[in-house]
Amino acid sequence: MVRIRLTRMGKRHMPFYRIVVVDSRKRRDGAYIESLGYYNPLRKPAEIKVNVERAVEWILKGAQPSETAANILSKAGVLAKVHEMKYGKREKSDEGVS
């Protein structure tokens, strides 16, 4: 199974993470298929940079994000874009308004 997850980079006590597409059987910092961006939790606010087009493409192909990666991709707007592409835009209805 192909997963989207984080791989740790940086030096001791100063981590940052790459968001990568990887075979789920590989080790955490092992070889990956493609790098989609990075996440730096030490910056305030946390710095997130993601190639949205490639991330959407991988998710539509069936790549499963890890729980942490899913939270980061959600903040970057990737999961909302995937939902919109799969199911269309949500329409507001006036049925409940009297």
Curated annotation (Swiss-Prot):
Record has Ribonucleoprotein as a keyword: yes
Keyword Translocase: no
GO MF term list: structural constituent of ribosome
SUPFAM superfamilies registered for this protein in UniProt: Ribosomal protein S16
Keywords attached to this entry: Ribonucleoprotein, Ribosomal protein
Pfam families: Ribosomal_S16
Protein name, per record: Small ribosomal subunit protein bS16
